[in-house]
Amino acid sequence: GMKLLYSVAWPGQSLYSNKPIQTPADLVGTKMRAYNPTSTRIAQLLKAQPVTIQLSELGQALATNTVNNFLTSSASGVESKLYEQIKYFYPVNAWLPRNATVVNQKAFDSLDKSLQDAVLKAAAAAEKRGWESSERLDKEYLKELAAKGMTVAEPSDALKKEFANIGNTMTEEWVKAAGADGKAIVDAYRKR
């Protein structure tokens, strides 16, 4: 009953750490912030200890060494002033959270063709503008994190590979749980 008009990504979820991270082994046994089943599973697959902490509690958790590292966006790092308590940032883009704008399919179908075309044209323009804004803002946030004293470094090939492997593992776990319909969705996505 819904029609997707457009979606736009937030800046990617990246790795913040209180020590340098060169390989996945550097994360083994560390205390990683988790705030939902997905982030908990990522921590488990990295062999880190998941610690449930909400963003609003992260400053205190860092101050008390309750967590050593976490995944969040460059935007959250700037807006929450995480640079005051943590020193290393790696743009691993573990995932790209998205906002989606949808419309009721019946309502859309009730519009005349010219109005449907106008809505779709406006949606395409909004999506393009949104993606450009997200990318621009991410670059600005990264510059600000560095200006505030954080080391902003590209993740090593080993770290990139580990996050890719985790993505594949979690996708396969989801497909297994979702069944044939889930497999069809993933297969269609991979064919794009």
Which residues fall in each region the model found?
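N-terminal secretory/targeting leader peptides
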Residues: 1-192
